[in-house]
C-alpha cells in the first residue's frame, strides 16, 4: 500500500528555478504577479525576478481633482497616491534583495494627469531603473497625461474640452512660447535617459525632453513621441537622427514639428498621427512594412516615401472631413499612394460618401477593416468592386442614424467578384440589428459563396432579441459548412 506522502500531488511549478517563475509572472498584470507572494514561502520573493513593471491610472481619473482635492484637502500632497504607492512598492521589493533580482526589462506607467508633486517620485523611479539596467535591454513607456491624441479637440485638466492650439510649427516663435505659458507644469526627463545604451524601446508622452548636448541611443529600435511640452521640431529631429538602429517610429500630436527626415535609416513601421502643422515628411520606405496615418487629407508634398515598392499594411484615419473638391482629390491621391497594400484598416467616420466615387483599385488587398458608421450599400459595393482579391472583411460598426427612405438594393447587385469567389471570412462587430445593419448582413452573406467563417459581435440586449438576430443572420447564408461565431 502506497504511503500518504507518495499519493500527495507534487507541485511541479514550484520546483522551477526563480528566474523562470519570474519570467512566467512577468506576463501577468503587475498587481496579480505581486499577489503570487501569498501562495507559499516558496513564492515569497519570486516577485524580485519579475522583469516587467506596469501601472496606470484610468483616463479621466484626475479630472475633478481641482474641485475635490486641491481646494478641500488639509494635507497638500499628490492625489495620485495609488499609482505612486504601487510603483514604489514594486521597486522597493526588488531593492530588498540587493543583487539577487533579475534586471528589469520593461518599465511602464501612465498618469491620467501628472502634477508637479509627483516629480520627485518619478525621478527616483527612473534613476533606479537606469542605474540597474546599464548592460541589459530596457523598454520604457512613460505617459504623463491620458487623453485624446488629436489636438483639435482635447480634454483639459478640468475635465472639459479646450479648442485647438495652433502653433507655428517652428522652434523660434516667441509669440508661440508666450501662448504656452499658461500650460500646466510638465515633467522634464532626466538627461541620463538619453545616454542609456540599454534602451531598446522609448515611448514618451506629454513631457519635456530637454535633450542634452549629446544623445547616445545606439540600440534604440522603437521610438514614440506624443505631444512633447516646449520641445521644438529641431529637438524631435535631433533625437530621431541620434538613433541609428531605429526601425519603428511614431510621431503623435507634435504641433511644433514642421518637417522631418528619416532618410538615413530604413524604417519598417511608421506612424504619423495628428501632427497638423507638419509640411513635409521624407522617409526611406524601401523596407517599410506598415504605415499608420491620422490627420487631414494630406497634400501631395506632405508624405514622400522614397524607394517604396508597396507597403503591405496601412491604417488610415482622417480626423477632419474633406470639405472641398480639392481636399477630396487629395484623399483619392493618398489612397492611390497606398493602393498596393495587402492589409488596409480605414477609419471612415469623417468621410462623406462623395469621397468614395473615385476610390482607387486595391488589386492586392486581402484583408480590409472598415471602422465607423456603417456605409450605405452603394458605397460598400463600390469598395468591394475595387478589391477583387479580398479574403477577409471586417466591419467595426459604430452607432449611426439610419438614412431616411433607405431603399434595399437588389441582392444580385452585390454579386461582386470578391464575394463570389474570394471572401472566406466576414466579421461584423457591434451588431445592434438596425435596418441598415440587417440589410448589409443579408446582402453580404447571401452573396458570399465561398465563405468559411463568420463572426458577429452583438451588442448587449435581451436574449430574445439576440436570438432572433442570430437566426436571421444564419438564414441569410448560402455557403455551406461555415464556422459560425456569435459573441
What is the predicted role of each segment?
Residues 270-338:
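Acidic, glycine-rich loop-and-beta core segments that form the ion-binding/anion-interacting portion
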Residues 2-255, 261, ...:
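Leucine-rich repeat
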Residues 192, 213-216, 236-239, 260, ...:
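C-terminal per-repeat helix/turn "cap" of leucine-rich repeat
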Amino acid at each position: 500500500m502506497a504511503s500518504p506522502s507518495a499519493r500527495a500531488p507534487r507541485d511541479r511549478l514550484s520546483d522551477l528555478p526563480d528566474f523562470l517563475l519570474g519570467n512566467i509572472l512577468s506576463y501577468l498584470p503587475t498587481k496579480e504577479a505581486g499577489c503570487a507572494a501569498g501562495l507559499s514561502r516558496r513564492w515569497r520573493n519570486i516577485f524580485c525576478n519579475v522583469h516587467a513593471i506596469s501601472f496606470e491610472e484610468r483616463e479621466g481619473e484626475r479630472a475633478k481633482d481641482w474641485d475635490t482635492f486641491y481646494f478641500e484637502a488639509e494635507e497638500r500632497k499628490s492625489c495620485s497616491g495609488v499609482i505612486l504607492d504601487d510603483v514604489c512598492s514594486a521597486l522597493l521589493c526588488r531593492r530588498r534583495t540587493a543583487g539577487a533580482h533579475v534586471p528589469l526589462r520593461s518599465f511602464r506607467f501612465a498618469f491620467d494627469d501628472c502634477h508637479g508633486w509627483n516629480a520627485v517620485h518619478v525621478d527616483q523611479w527612473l534613476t533606479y531603473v537606469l542605474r540597474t539596467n546599464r548592460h541589459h535591454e530596457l523598454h520604457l513607456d512613460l505617459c504623463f497625461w491620458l487623453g485624446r491624441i488629436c489636438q483639435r479637440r482635447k480634454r483639459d485638466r478640468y475635465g472639459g474640452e479646450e479648442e485647438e492650439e495652433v502653433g507655428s510649427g517652428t522652434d523660434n516663435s516667441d509669440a508661440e512660447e508666450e501662448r504656452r505659458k499658461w500650460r500646466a507644469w510638465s515633467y522634464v526627463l532626466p538627461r541620463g535617459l538619453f545616454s542609456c545604451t540599454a534602451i531598446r524601446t522609448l515611448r514618451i508622452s506629454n513631457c519635456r525632453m530637454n535633450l542634452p548636448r549629446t544623445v547616445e541611443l545606439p540600440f534604440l529600435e522603437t521610438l514614440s513621441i506624443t505631444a512633447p511640452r516646449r520641445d521644438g521640431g529641431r529637438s524631435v529631429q535631433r533625437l530621431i537622427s541620434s538613433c541609428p538602429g531605429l526601425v519603428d517610429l511614431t510621431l503623435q500630436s507634435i504641433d511644433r514639428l514642421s518637417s522631418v527626415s528619416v532618410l538615413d535609416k530604413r524604417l519598417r513601421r511608421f506612424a504619423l498621427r495628428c501632427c497638423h502643422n507638419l509640411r513635409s515628411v521624407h522617409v526611406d520606405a524601401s523596407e517599410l512594412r506598415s504605415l499608420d496615418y491620422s490627420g487631414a487629407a494630406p497634400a501631395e508634398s506632405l508624405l514622400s516615401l522614397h524607394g517604396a515598392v508597396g507597403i503591405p499594411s496601412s491604417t488610415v484615419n482622417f480626423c477632419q472631413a474633406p470639405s472641398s473638391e480639392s481636399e477630396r482629390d487629395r484623399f483619392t491621391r493618398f489612397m492611390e499612394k497606398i493602393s498596393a497594400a495587402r492589409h488596409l484598416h480605414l477609419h471612415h467616420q469623417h468621410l462623406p460618401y462623395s469621397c468614395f466615387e473615385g476610390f482607387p483599385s486595391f488589386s492586392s488587398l486581402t484583408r480590409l477593416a472598415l471602422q465607423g458608421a456603417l456605409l450605405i450599400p452603394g458605397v460598400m459595393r463600390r469598395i468591394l468592386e475595387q478589391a477583387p482579391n479580398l479574403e477577409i472583411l471586417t466591419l467595426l460598426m459604430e452607432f449611426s442614424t439610419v438614412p431616411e427612405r433607405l431603399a434595399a438594393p437588389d441582392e444580385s447587385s452585390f454579386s461582386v467578384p470578391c464575394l463570389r469567389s474570394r471572401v472566406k471570412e466576414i466579421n461584423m462587430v457591434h451588431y445592434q440589428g438596425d435596418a441598415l445593419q440587417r440589410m448589409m448582413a443579408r446582402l453580404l452573406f447571401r452573396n458570399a459563396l465561398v465563405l468559411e467563417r463568420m463572426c458577429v459581435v452583438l451588442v448587449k440586449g435581451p436574449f430574445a432579441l439576440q436570438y432572433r438576430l442570430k437566426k436571421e443572420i444564419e438564414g441569410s447564408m448560402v455557403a455551406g459548412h461555415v464556422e459560425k461565431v456569435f459573441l
